[in-house]
Amino acid sequence: GLIAYFPEPSFITKNDLALDCALTIRRLVYDGLNPVFEQNDYPGINVRIGLDSGDAYVVTIGSPATKSHKDIIGSIVSLSAKIQSLGGSGDILLGEVTERNLHTMWREICEEIELKKDWKYKGMDGEPYKVYKVKFR
């Protein structure tokens, strides 16, 4: 797994940057790495990506006397993982906040997905938190 953290230059810009990064990772894996793996009789790898926006904090776990490490914590980290788990191979899924704050050109390639009945996450309005999928041609 991989967690990417996009700190502020601006809230809106970081949503666009996060989606651009996700599209680049997907393209690199499926158009760059997998063809080379397959030519050498290795299985390709699959990725699915979940994005959302909100407060996250970079913290140091441990002390200088021990092997400390950095981690990213916050409810948004857990929600992004839950969003990612809804996808299939090659999918890029976005939470409602991320989709709403994307530039129009990015929003045009996203469509809301139907959520399973066991999806428990609610938005600020008390309604089920929406999830969007990036459409590929």
Task: Identify the residue ranges that each predicted region occupies.
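Catalytic core of nucleotidyl cyclases, primarily class III adenylyl/guanylyl cyclases
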Residues: 1-14, 33-73
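Short amphipathic C-terminal alpha-helix that caps PH/PH-like domains
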Residues: 21-22
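Serine endopeptidase catalytic core focused on the charge-relay Asp
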Residues: 25
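Conserved, well-folded catalytic cores of nucleic-acid-processing
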Residues: 28, 32, 86-89
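Solvent-exposed amphipathic alpha-helical surface segments
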Residues: 29-36, 105, 109
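Catalytic/regulatory signature loops of cyclic-dinucleotide turnover enzymes
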Residues: 52, 75-100
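Intrinsically disordered, glycine/charged-rich C-terminal tails and inter-domain linkers
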Residues: 89-137
